[in-house]
Amino acid sequence: MKIHLIRHAHAGSRSAWDKADHKRPLSPRGEGQAKAVAAALADAGIDELWSSPSLRCRQTLVPLAEATGLEVQVVDVLDEGNDGPPALDALLAAAAEGRVVAACSHGDVIPAVVATATRRGAELEGPRAISKAGRYVCTVADGQITHILAVPPPDGDT
């Protein structure tokens, strides 16, 4: 069983955005990254798409939703500022029911999920933090993540 953790694609500068941050959209570069992520995951057997409530996360998953015919579900535990254990536990509950989830979140939440999984015994192959549009492929066995593979962003950003 797999869980795919995706950091949202490029959304431009937070400091240059004068509205509520959760409404900040993807930049043109981010739109291209989102399409590349979709191309990479379209045939990954994903059953559900989960997103932080933030627009940039939902937009990151739109091309994958179009490619798979799935709807993007907003999941509050993936919102920026949340801790790793609740998000990880929600993802593991889905995996326990046999669902493959692709979840898009933020640069604080995803490393917290990875850190929680490694504290619980998962092996991490790659960096603990990834750039925008980077992702982790997590292998689940016996109710826990056992292996995490870091996949760099599609445009090679580091």
Segments predicted by a language model, with ranges:
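Generic beta-sheet signal
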Residues: I3, E97-D108
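Short hydrophobic/charged patches on amphipathic alpha-helices used for structural packing
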Residues: A38, D89-L92
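Domain-level recognition of soluble alpha/beta enzyme cores
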Residues: T118-L149, P153
